[in-house]
């Protein structure tokens, strides 16, 4: 499972012109699931994302987590995080999990985050054509991969 975590002043996801979720301040998390991912991967990343200290403390040092600042989280499914660009110029998404595998793990990720955070957890709709808007704060962008545990 791969995540792109962005610290945001605000973020929103629209589906068909209707706002499906909005947060701020907090995190926008793009989540990509591959076939080999497990519930353990999901739980590890949910715990890391909730505890990652990327918000400033009183001294301006990145020392607080989204949990500690009671921030909100917007989770958006993003199968393209598993794109392979090895051959040619057209990305291959063969490593991305099929919906029947990915949806239960995506739902578990949101549930795990919600159980860890006092702030809101909002989301887009898995597999939908979505428009995501955000205002980066910093910017701070972190990439995580459960396979590499980094």
UniProtKB/Swiss-Prot annotation:
Enzyme Commission number: 3.1.1.96
InterPro entries documented for this protein: Daa-tRNA_deacyls_DTD (IPR003732), DTD-like_sf (IPR023509)
Main location: cytoplasm
Compartment(s): Cytoplasm
Keywords: Cytoplasm, Hydrolase, RNA-binding, tRNA-binding
Disulfide bonds: none
Gene Ontology CC entries for this record: cytoplasm
Function: An aminoacyl-tRNA editing enzyme that deacylates mischarged D-aminoacyl-tRNAs. Also deacylates mischarged glycyl-tRNA(Ala), protecting cells against glycine mischarging by AlaRS. Acts via tRNA-based rather than protein-based catalysis; rejects L-amino acids rather than detecting D-amino acids in the active site. By recycling D-aminoacyl-tRNA to D-amino acids and free tRNA molecules, this enzyme counteracts the toxicity associated with the formation of D-aminoacyl-tRNA entities in vivo and helps enforce protein L-homochirality.
NCBIfam families attached to this UniProt entry: D-aminoacyl-tRNA deacylase
Entry-linked HAMAP family: Deacylase_Dtd (MF_00518)
Protein name: D-aminoacyl-tRNA deacylase
Species annotation: Akkermansia muciniphila (strain ATCC BAA-835 / DSM 22959 / JCM 33894 / BCRC 81048 / CCUG 64013 / CIP 107961 / Muc)
């Amino acid at each position: 499972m791969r995540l792109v975590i962005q610290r945001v002043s605000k973020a929103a996801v629209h589906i068909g012109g209707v706002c499906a979720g909005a947060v701020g301040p907090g995190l926008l998390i793009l989540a990509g699931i591959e076939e080999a991912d497990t519930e353990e991967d999901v739980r590890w990343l949910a715990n890391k994302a909730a505890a990652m200290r990327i918000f400033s403390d009183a001294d301006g040092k990145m020392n607080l987590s989204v949990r500690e600042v009671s921030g909100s989280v917007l989770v958006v499914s993003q199968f393209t995080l598993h794109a392979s660009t090895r051959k040619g110029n057209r990305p291959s998404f063969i490593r991305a999990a099929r919906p029947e595998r990915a949806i239960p793990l995506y739902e578990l990720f949101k549930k795990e985050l919600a159980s860890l955070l006092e702030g809101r957890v909002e989301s887009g709709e898995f597999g939908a054509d979505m428009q995501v808007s955000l205002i980066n704060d910093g910017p701070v962008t972190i990439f995580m991969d459960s396979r590499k545990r980094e």
